[in-house]
Amino acid sequence: MESKNFKLPSPLATVIVGTQFGDEGKGKLVDYLSANYDIVVRYQGGANAGHTICFDGKSVVLHLVPSGIFHEGCTCVIGNGVVIDPVALLEEIKTVENLGYDVRGRLFISHNAHLIMPYHKLLDSLHESAQGDQKIGTTGRGIGPSYEDKVARKGIRVVDLLNPELLKEKLRENLSAKNKLLRNIYDREEIDVEAMVQEYEEFDKIIDPYVTNTQAYLTRELQAGKTVLLEGAQGCLLDVDHGTYPYVTSSNPTSGGACTGSGIAPNYIGKVIGITKAYMTRVGNGAFPTELLDETGELLGKIGHEFGATTGRKRRCGWLDLVALRYSLAINGVTEIALTKLDVLDSFEEIKVCTAYLLDGKELHDFPTDHQTLAQVTPVYTTLKGWMASNAAARTFEEMQLEAQRYVDFLEEQVQLPVTFISVGPGRDETVFR
């Protein structure tokens, strides 16, 4: 048989994943790398996670629009795996435009992305309030209820805004069930269907120019040789399948979610960069083996400004956990590590790193997948010498403080992956590449 030269996909896409409980500093890396990519895609989550970008003396928080929007040559895509709050999205678009950046023609929204409706946010808050001590720690932004409707095949998608009659029909069907909950369970007033239809028809007029079949668009661009950077929200340990269930988010922040949430085929993925904070934080409830409930934890939070970009909630702080990190690196197929917020450790004489867990007198090196077991483990620490000086002026690894270099070397040795990016300060330029 005559051989045929079929054109196979080139690995032109890079996935950026958080390897911890979110808040790892993904926004800075995406912002930094966006200048080298043609397209940046957000593939899951919603307005429950904020990416903070610092440039030109400004600090901007984005929840839905990809961080690459601040690079003029970059096109941004909100993928089908994202749940979109139209109100929050329009506010972000306005914020970006007010900073002098063009959005139209540079931002595309998947017609298959699901919408967060007002009843999702209301039910989210009411349900969380009713949980008492069993609260998950939701942001109250309607993310979970929107994903619930998606899985139940009752969700309202962006494409539904383009058909007012279909939108009205779906809203009536959904609100029939939601209003029963509001009235009978939570003793709240029902939501008016007609008012909501009118409100969302107005959203359609504004959003329509941005809506497209993003899966087809991304595939065409990749086939044409364009490069794509995919960014998720939260982190691996909050993944609904692989995280500390039930204290997790409602989607898949892992690298597998990048494909399902964007429509990009796996064989287009060439690199997976794991964003890892030099220490650990967590927002809300759930097991956290290395959490520091003392002055050290308070100091980490104070120096690191550890307050949620979305909710303003104080983050719990602790030392770096290599048991959890190895687990995340394996699940995501991470090819290299980006180490963030190393500067927060500049003031510590000693720095501890968890290398194993103790449970019932036995040492564990595998991350427990059930929350009950994880809540019972005790961390085993290795203590490293601190560097007690700033690395903010360093632009090469050799210019960093010697003990800071040793900290990075120790991390690489423990996880057997290269650390190729080190953030030594919040600014764009306060970065070391290797």
Swiss-Prot record:
Gene Ontology terms: biological process: 'de novo' AMP biosynthetic process; IMP metabolic process
Lineage summary: Bacteria, Pseudomonadati, Chlorobiota, Chlorobiia, Chlorobiales
Keyword Magnesium: yes
Pathway: Purine metabolism; AMP biosynthesis via de novo pathway; AMP from IMP: step 1/2
Annotated protein name in UniProt: Adenylosuccinate synthetase
NCBIfam families per UniProt: PRK01117.1, purA
Compartments it resides in: Cytoplasm
Annotated keywords: Cytoplasm, GTP-binding, Ligase, Magnesium, Metal-binding, Nucleotide-binding, Purine biosynthesis
Catalytic activity: IMP + L-aspartate + GTP = N(6)-(1,2-dicarboxyethyl)-AMP + GDP + phosphate + 2 H(+)
Binding site residues for Mg(2+): D23, G50
Residues holding IMP: D23, E24, G25, K26, N48, A49, G50, H51, T139, R153, Q234, T249, R313
